[in-house]
């Protein structure tokens, strides 16, 4: 269950960034999670909810945008959204070209796990 370690890293990074910017409250965090990370967004959100209890991040809205797998095929030159072999073990997704079914593809998107945006409130904004 790598959702726990990823959730912990994200919560720590969000709280550290908020602290460095003198935040008194975090109101929103937007995350980008690639399909090839094999992270379950519901489990990730659940873990983050537990880890952010009793912090300035506790009541913030968390938005998780899933990023589809984008590939470029070495054989036919296709460039676009891929499909994964759903018959494979869930621990190892295989991206294939939707045009020629080849697995010789360059993965362009779908592996990321980013904190895209953090919205905060500062004390001076409430004065």
Swiss-Prot record:
Sequence positions that bind Ni(2+): 2
Record GO terms (molecular function): nickel cation binding; zinc ion binding
Sequence positions that bind Zn(2+): 73, 76, 97, 100
Annotated Gene3D superfamilies: 3.30.2320.80
Superkingdom field: Archaea
One matching Pfam family: HypA
GO annotation terms (biological process): protein maturation; protein modification process
Keyword set, alphabetical order: Metal-binding, Nickel, Zinc
Record has Metal-binding as a keyword: yes
Protein family (similarity comment): Belongs to the HypA/HybF family.
NCBIfam families tied to this protein: hypA (TIGR00100), PRK00762.1 (NF001976)
Protein task: Involved in the maturation of [NiFe] hydrogenases. Required for nickel insertion into the metal center of the hydrogenase.
Record's protein name: Hydrogenase maturation factor HypA
Upper lineage: Archaea, Methanobacteriati, Methanobacteriota, Methanomada group, Methanobacteria
Gene: hypA
């Amino acid at each position: 269950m790598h959702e726990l370690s990823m959730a912990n890293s994200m919560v720590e990074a969000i709280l550290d960034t908020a602290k460095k910017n003198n935040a008194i409250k975090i109101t929103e965090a937007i995350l980008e999670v690639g399909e090839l990370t094999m992270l379950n967004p519901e489990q990730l959100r659940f873990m983050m909810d537990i880890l952010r209890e009793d912090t300035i991040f506790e009541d913030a809205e968390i938005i998780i945008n899933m990023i589809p797998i984008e590939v470029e095929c070495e054989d036919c030159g296709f460039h676009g959204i891929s499909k994964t072999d759903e018959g494979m073990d869930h621990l190892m997704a295989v991206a294939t070209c939707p045009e020629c079914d080849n697995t010789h593809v360059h993965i362009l998107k779908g592996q990321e796990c980013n904190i895209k945006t953090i919205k905060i409130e500062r004390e001076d904004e409430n004065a």
